[in-house]
């Protein structure tokens, strides 16, 4: 089972909450050191995220990985989770098959949108079969758009969402952005380049500091930054939809719920203040997260633990100086 998850699940159930876990495959964003081999993806190429070549998946590997999604559901259920969230966005493996930016295949898994959805359908079939056998709920995280020219745009994404809906999943989490190409389209806000380089391997630091500002497009933060685009999906779909993206206040959450979304997700607001939801529950209409979206937590999360800079008493001097300069 999943070592270390028992306490989290037990405490969630004790408080009356269901426990969900995200399942997915990084594909071409997998680090060589993690995989122990050249990473696989929808197509061959080079992974700028982990600085390693990528090998196109064979048909037998596609079949095996899709079955592994079903195994992941059964593993999650055995560990005590009530729900799984299939990650089909942000440029991870399912998203790599869906996006024309990363899918250059000339077989039945590439080309037309129907072909590019084939791997996703295979994964969902395995997931839904395992979910039916175990009584596990299923959510799917889905990209509304990739965030750059040549990627998935909203009209095509709505067709993908309709296909997901046909599999009778319990809900879709609407997101956007592509970590290996447009990471800040996912998260928005400031880009702490020095902090990113500080927590990277020594050989990589200079590249990030000097090339990072030119490679990473900035997307300004605004509260509920995905909401207007997400409303287009609300109009097109019947299943429950979950809004995520820039929720930092009671007013923002109410805007999302009043727009027809059944549930909301938050991340950085809770990294900043784990008690944020309880404060909302206490009824203070002015409750607002103190997260300032300087994204220190994002800059360090792939190298060390994810932590808000406001809770780090041992920040290195140069990182403190960088954060102080950010508006």
Placement of each model-derived feature along the sequence:
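Glycine-rich phosphate-binding active-site loops on the catalytic face of alpha/beta enzymes
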Residues: 171, 246, 259-279
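Catalytic cores of alpha/beta
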Residues: 155, 161, 247-262, 266
């Amino acid at each position: 089972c999943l070592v270390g998850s028992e306490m989290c699940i037990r405490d969630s159930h004790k408080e009356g909450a269901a426990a969900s876990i995200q399942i997915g495959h990084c594909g071409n964003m997998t680090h060589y050191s993690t995989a122990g081999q050249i990473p696989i993806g929808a197509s061959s190429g080079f992974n700028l995220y982990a600085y390693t070549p990528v090998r196109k998946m064979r048909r037998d590997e596609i079949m095996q990985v899709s079955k592994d999604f079903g195994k992941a559901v059964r593993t999650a259920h055995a560990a005590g989770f009530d729900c799984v969230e299939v990650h089909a966005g942000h440029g991870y493996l399912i998203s790599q098959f869906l996006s024309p930016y990363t899918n250059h295949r000339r077989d039945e898994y590439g080309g037309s949108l129907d072909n590019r959805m084939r791997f996703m359908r295979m994964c969902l079939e395995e997931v839904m079969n395992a979910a039916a056998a175990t009584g596990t709920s299923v959510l799917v995280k889905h990209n509304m758009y990739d965030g750059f020219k040549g990627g998935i745009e909203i009209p095509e994404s709505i067709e993908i969402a309709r296909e997901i809906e046909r599999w009778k999943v319990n809900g879709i989490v609407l997101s956007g952005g592509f970590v290996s190409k447009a990471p800040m389209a996912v998260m928005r806000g400031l880009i702490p380049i020095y902090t990113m380089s500080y927590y990277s391997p020594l050989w990589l630091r200079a590249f990030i500091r000097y090339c990072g500002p030119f490679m990473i497009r900035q997307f300004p933060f605004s509260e509920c930054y995905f909401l207007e685009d997400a409303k287009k999906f609300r109009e097109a779909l019947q299943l429950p939809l979950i809004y995520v993206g820039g929720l930092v206040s009671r007013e923002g959450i109410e805007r999302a719920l009043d727009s027809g979304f059944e549930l909301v997700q938050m991340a950085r607001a809770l990294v900043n203040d784990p008690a944020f939801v309880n404060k909302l529950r206490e009824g203070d209409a002015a409750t607002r997260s103190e997260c300032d979206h300087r994204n220190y937590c994002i800059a360090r999360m792939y190298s060390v633990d994810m932590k808000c800079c406001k809770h780090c008493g041992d920040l290195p001097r140069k990182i403190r100086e960088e954060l102080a300069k950010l508006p």
